[in-house]
Amino acid sequence: QLPVLQAAPQLKDPAHFRFLSIQNQGGTRATIDAARPVLRELAETANRVRRVAVPASKLVIGLQCGGSDGLSGITANPALGVASDLVVAQGGTTILSETSEIYGAEHLLTGRATPEVAEQLMERIRWWEDYAARFGGNMDNNPSPGNKRGGLTTILEKSLGAVAKGGSAPLTAVYRYADPIRQPGFVFMDSPGYDPCSVTGQVASGANMIVFTTGRGSVSGYRPVPCLKLASNNDLWSRMGEDMDINCGDILDGVSLQDKGAEIYRAILDVASGQPTKSEAQGFGRVEFV
């Protein structure tokens, strides 16, 4: 399998993809010894890489929420939707996912899409309905115990908040899980509702940053890319400020969604320019990525 992967046309420079086999090298210690010079060579190559300025159109943002509460759909999620629109306006890409968590609110997406794209989204929803039914479940059972303790009681409430992350830009494409994103704009990638699995697909599709809203206090990170955390309420911000990047609870105190969305967009640019996120500073992200 590894030789096939090394020969994949998607690899810009196959020479940077190296692998050693314990069986072929003659044991564990021999493999470690053989790996040392290879790692030195790769480190020298990596050290020659320099950051260069690129336009905001290069941004590919995975939109995520986890540990949502009753305020997520009022504060953090719609504010992220404003930021999503700003990214798209600059020629960038934002990816909404978690198909089981838009259930009941899909009309808010299909109404912003061409008939062809709308049908692609509905086909994915029908697949998930069938999948749940085959295993004796139903799509209405999605809200977790934590969601319910936070004030979300039905999938419809949760879905309305989840869709708000997508702002108001037209839905330009629907992708299968982990398929490469081929065009900019606001797009949807089919995925389960489980955050690590969904983020894995988004990163495989081309996301270079995750922006993640939470009301209950998720501290997950996703090591291949930075993860910017948005708190939905002031209480979470006051208790877990060391893990949250932006407080969206002040929207309830009068800060407008437009101003908060602009703040999130500026933070996205800062992180893309090298500023570490809180989850990176805390060392999260080694195990959350599938």
Model regions and ranges:
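Metallocofactor- and cofactor-centric catalytic cores in central/energy metabolism, strongly enriched
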Residues: 1-209, 216-290
